[in-house]
Amino acid sequence: LSGIRVVQSFANEDIEREKFRVGNEAFLDSKRDNYRAMGSFQSGNTFFQGMMYLVTLLAGGYFIALGQMSAADLAMYALNIGIFISPIQILVELTEMIQKGMSGFIRYQSVIDIEPEITDSVDAVNMKHPDGDICYHDVSFSYEDNEIVLNHIDFTIKSGKSIALVGPSGGGKTTICSLLPRFYDITDGLITIGGQNIKDIKLESLRSSIGIVQQDVYLFGGSVKENIAYGNPDATFDEIVEAAKKANIHDFIMTLPNGYDTFVGERGTRLSGGQKQRISIARVFLKNPPILILDEATSALDNESEQHIQKSLDALSENRTTITIAHRLSTIQNADEILVID
């Protein structure tokens, strides 16, 4: 559903409808075999139960006619049939439920058992100086295929200053930023914040001190208020409104049918790119981190939207240590230093 606009723009409804049909038929085939087996058992069990009642009644009637059995004895035998059959029925139904539950539990367990690649070190502590200088000391990085992405990177960002990273696509700008919150771990070298090695900092403490505004904004399928509050779940409504005002999105929100309680759709499909971006900026305002990463936050916007967003970003960057990735000169003209990554 989140890609419905792409489907409509390419007029590929028939293709998606066919995919849906094929998937449904595969699901139906798997269920058909299951229900056929269960139906065979249920019908067989019902037939067996009916035959037992019939045999009991015929035999009981015969013995009653001979005077060897009373009507009360026949009723007791008939009741015993139900008592005998019922546990078997329950056992089979329970077996089916266990099989369904086990298959779901196995899938759940396979996800839960995945160990995160990056974890806290044994002696990790909270960040001591989140507003300190950020230093990349002889940093190198490569992915699992051993292809070198960054090779001996050295630079320092003074506390409260703004640095811009520019260069061709694929040069490693986003990778440099991703190393700071430890989305990846460096292959060699050292990254410090306020003189403290980021590997010695608890991940929660490290990442709570860093705000990230990305090009591809992800909004959850909830209300505007819930999406902004994601930056600080304990924030009051007044604080949420204040963050929205700083991001220049409050006036727009008030025009929505339910204001801050308006549902934004899965991934924010009911909002424009600029509106989603400003909500994500409000989210970071609410988080109020000392370190800010702007990863091509305006590259996908038109000029008019970019101007509005840039004002919000300038306000957000004030008095924060900021790393900006951008291709447009207008985005980085206020940076204290520009680094070219080639």
Model-inferred region functions:
Residues 20, 108, 136-138:
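Conserved catalytic Walker-motif region of ABC-type ATPase nucleotide-binding domains
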